[in-house]
Regions:
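A structural motif corresponding to the C-terminal lobe/cap of the Radical SAM core domain
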Residues: 1-153, 157
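Long, low-complexity C-terminal extensions of enzymes
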Residues: 154-176
């Protein structure tokens, strides 16, 4: 159901950038792999991975406090790191650390990013509901190009995207 909902939203040209939260009690030992597979299957090109954090005043915070699973700090953390939490997880800490690091390596690998981008573009091209934008939007294409060209890895990824668009000229109309 979720995969079809994501495809439907993206078929109109929207880019979904979900929060990927790991560390739920219901997470299985395949959660990292399943999340990566889901991203490819539905062509998600962005997202924000992190660990579950119990925010003060929420039911989760109270539940973790009542069950002795809340890690209290002297000061409340306002800016957090991706791998920081205040919850004692049920899953093994080493499993979560290793799984998250492996996930990030694969998630940010240029080939994996390109695979997701290609799937996203293919879904848009197959769609009869795509609505192209008729303006530039908030970003400056020239500034974007400068950023891409300065960084070696970004430049390589950018060139892969351009090569894909050149090989499939019909895709260009979907991008523009």
């Amino acid at each position: 159901v979720l995969d079809q909902a994501v495809r439907t939203i993206q078929s109109y040209g929207f880019i979904i950038a979900p929060g990927m939260i790991f560390g739920f009690d219901s997470d299985t030992d395949t959660v990292f792999e399943e999340t990566l597979d889901f991203f490819v299957d539905v062509g998600l090109i962005g997202g924000d991975p992190s660990f579950l954090m119990a925010l003060s005043g929420t039911p989760l915070y109270r539940r973790m406090e009542q069950t002795g699973r809340l890690i209290k700090r002297e000061e409340e953390v306002t800016v957090r790191k991706k791998i920081e939490t205040n919850i004692r997880y049920i899953q093994d800490a080493e499993f979560l650390k290793k799984g998250f690091v492996d996930f990030i390596h694969r998630y940010t690998e240029p080939g994996f990013q390109f695979t997701r981008f290609k799937k996203h573009m293919d879904l848009i091209m197959e769609s009869d509901t795509f609505i192209p934008i008729d303006h530039v939007g908030y970003g400056s294409p020239l500034e974007y190009l400068k950023i891409q060209i300065k960084d070696v890895q970004n430049r390589k990824m950018f060139m892969l995207h351009i090569a894909y668009l050149i090989r499939k000229p019909s895709t260009i109309s979907a991008v523009l």
